[in-house]
Amino acid sequence: MKLSSVIPWALLLSTATVDSMDWLPRNTNCGGILKEESGVIATYYGPKTNCVWTIQMPPEYHVRVSIQYLQLNCNKESLEIIDGLPGSPVLGKICEGSLMDYRSSGSIMTVKYIREPEHPASFYEVLYFQDPQA
């Protein structure tokens, strides 16, 4: 990756962290198709236990996903980052960590949140935005 493409990404993340990402569209539903150029997938506290968001960008863009901080109960819940539509290769299945960054190989990425039915949802925020094809 070129340094010139890293700098805007770092600036966006630092701004998003300071401003708590309040300026981005927030999705707190359990799944859906997201077509905004950027936004936040935020904790869904409802009764559903398997939430799938498919992020679609125009063909000339990749999807970039960033998770600043994640502390899920690893035995009971996880986030899965998929490179494309559901059923495509999994880029990561995660439950904890910080400063995680994923980039799709094409213009679609899927984020899946799964938890056990008796376990309450933990806090999570997933920032997504379009990234020009290089």
Swiss-Prot record:
Residues 1-20 form the signal peptide. Gene3D superfamilies: Spermadhesin, CUB domain (2.60.120.290). It comes from Bos taurus (Bovine). This is Spermadhesin-1. Belongs to the spermadhesin family. The keyword Secreted applies. It is found in: Secreted. PROSITE patterns: CUB (PS01180), SPERMADHESIN_1 (PS00985), SPERMADHESIN_2 (PS00986). Stimulates cell division and progesterone secretion of bovine granulosa cells in vitro in a potent and dose dependent manner. This protein appears to be a potent growth factor with effects on ovarian granulosa cells. GO terms for biological process: single fertilization. Seminal vesicle tissue, ampulla and weakly in tissue of epididymis. The gene is SPADH1. It comes from the Eukaryota. GO terms for molecular function: growth factor activity. GO terms for cellular component: extracellular region. Keywords: Disulfide bond, Growth factor, Secreted, Signal. Disulfide bonds join 30-51, 74-95. Residues 30-131 form the CUB domain. It holds the Pfam family CUB.
